[in-house]
Amino acid sequence: MNKEPYFLRVMKQSPTEFWINNPTRRQADLAIANGATGCTNNPSYTQKMLDHPDEGEYALKFLDEAVQETDDDWECAEVFQRKMVKPIAEKFMPVFEKTDGERGHVSIQGDPINEDDPEVIIRDAFANRKISPNICCKIPTTSSGLKAMEVMIEENIPINATEIFGVSQMVTICEKYLEISKRTGKRPAF
């Protein structure tokens, strides 16, 4: 019987890689131990952690800190999300360092209410990158998101193109990535 974790076996046999979505700290540890190469967090992550029986009290501590840092509700939500994602990013740093930044990314997405404003997406992406060097900016593959992705690629910032619902969207972002990479010589994780 093969004792190697399932996800490590799959990665050796195919180009498939295992990312975990919206994990608790314990789930992140288990995922990494079983071959996870990255993590993604949705805008709903903080609420899921507040509601989680093992994470709720921990999350409330960060929410209290965020409330003390700003009077603006929108900014508070962003600060809270960053505070919650940072410990997860720290857990994936050894993977990131071991692979020279090829794996171990933790993606974070801003509030989807702003997904039609490329300037807000860009601002949020730069702010999110301050969390940790392994932060990957999760950006919707919409016309506004594509504008933001252009800036991220030019700045050599890893991106996670999300909300891809058709082949044409995938082709568009891949063509855009190749075009900008060719022009700038930058090839961030994608």
Where are these regions (language model features)?
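N- or domain-start disorder-to-order transition segments that initiate the globular core
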Residues: 1-26
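An N-terminal structural lobe/cap that precedes and organizes the functional/catalytic core
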Residues: 8, 27-61
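Anion (oxyanion) recognition and catalysis
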Residues: 12, 32, 153
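Short, well-ordered coil/turn segments that N-cap beta-strands
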Residues: 14-16, 36-37, 101-106, 131-135, ...
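Catalytic beta/alpha-barrel core
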Residues: 19-20, 134-142, 157-169
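Catalytic cores of alpha/beta
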Residues: 25-33, 147-148, 170-178
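Active-site beta->alpha loop and helix N-cap motifs at the rims of alpha/beta catalytic domains
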Residues: 45-48, 53-144, 148
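Catalytic alpha/beta core domains of metabolic enzymes, predominantly
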Residues: 151, 158-190
